[in-house]
């Protein structure tokens, strides 16, 4: 509750600041500099500029921004072309860097005549990596909405299946997933026959509707965890400290219709991992901005929206302001009263 109150407060403050710019400044205010979508990009930025992928399952969502000058930025993650100078170490698929083998590589993103690079190190690729229960399975259940209060996270559960609210009791969830319903809930011998997968995929009637898409991050995490025997992590496994949501607050003008989000998880052993694919997103105003399951914000209208990212029990926010040019607008030049 306190976190959501803080988000609402920041949302109100940002609106006041924007209104102040409208009232107190002239048409030269930089927030309202006109964007010409045809203007060639002046510079390109890729985030994170340097990162490490640990293990054969590691990935990193990239964020590429075009800065056309005049305070005009837009997301170009899905528009640029990518190249890895060492495909035996890392490859790029749909804007995601995926580990292929140990070593280092440079990723180059290009848009027209400009480019930006990121340095990647891949470690422990040959080391088997089990799906962690606490940081991936619980996150997958939360992202899919299975453990929300209106679903199986309610005190009495749904359809005889009960999970802790948003994964706040991992031990209860582990017992439930391993042993309930005569092991039909999760079938380690035939993972694809598990009700935990078939129901949210709508292969079997499910009152909660479709919650998973075959092949998405949540589905793969749950399936692989079941196939591996539904293990939990050993003692001393690094825990999550905090998350960071990118980009930082920004203003998007005409021509900027979407914004890729990236969520970085900071763990107790000092490692930083991409957790975007298993993060749940929300928006303060769906008439201004909507969010896809892949973490892409799409413009719905004009105004400001606060974007909330929730991974396990950690949250982070950013603000996106969508501006639209109004050619018919004329400053009324009110008379001075002081």
PLM regions and their residue ranges:
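N-terminal secretory signal peptides that target proteins for export/translocation
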Residues: 1-13
């Amino acid at each position: 509750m306190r976190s959501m109150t803080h988000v609402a407060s920041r949302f109100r403050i940002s609106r006041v600041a924007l209104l102040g710019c409208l009232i107190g400044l002239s048409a030269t205010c930089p927030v309202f500099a006109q964007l010409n979508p045809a203007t060639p990009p002046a510079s390109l930025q890729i985030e994170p500029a340097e990162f490490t992928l640990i293990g054969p399952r590691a990935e990193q969502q990239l964020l590429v921004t075009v800065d056309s000058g005049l305070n005009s930025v837009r997301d170009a993650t899905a528009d640029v072309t990518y190249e890895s100078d060492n495909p035996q170490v890392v490859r790029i698929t749909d804007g995601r860097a995926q580990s292929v083998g140990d070593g280092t590589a440079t990723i180059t993103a290009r848009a027209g005549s400009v480019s930006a690079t990121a340095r990647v190190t891949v470690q422990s690729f040959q080391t088997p990596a089990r799906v962690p229960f606490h940081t991936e399975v619980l996150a997958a259940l939360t992202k899919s909405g299975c453990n929300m209060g209106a679903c199986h996270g309610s005190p009495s559960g749904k359809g005889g299946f009960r999970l802790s609210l948003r994964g706040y009791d991992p031990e209860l969830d582990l017992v439930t997933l391993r042993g309930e319903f005569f092991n039909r809930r999760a079938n380690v011998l035939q993972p694809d026959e598990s009700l935990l997968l078939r129901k949210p995929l709508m292969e079997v009637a499910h009152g909660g509707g479709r919650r998973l898409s075959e092949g998405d991050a949540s589905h793969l995490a749950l399936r692989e965890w079941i196939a591996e025997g539904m293990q939990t992590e050993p003692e001393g496994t690094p825990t999550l400290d905090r998350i960071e949501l990118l980009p930082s607050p920004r203003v998007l003008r005409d021509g900027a219709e979407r914004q890729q989000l990236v969520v970085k998880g900071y763990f107790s052993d000092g490692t930083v991992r991409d957790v975007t694919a298993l993060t749940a997103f929300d928006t303060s105003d769906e008439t201004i901005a909507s969010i896809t399951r892949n973490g892409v914000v799409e413009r719905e209208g004009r105004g400001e929206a606060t974007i909330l990212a929730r991974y396990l029990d950690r949250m982070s926010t950013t603000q996106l302001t969508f501006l639209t040019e109004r050619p018919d607008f004329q400053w009324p030049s009110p008379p001075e009263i002081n």
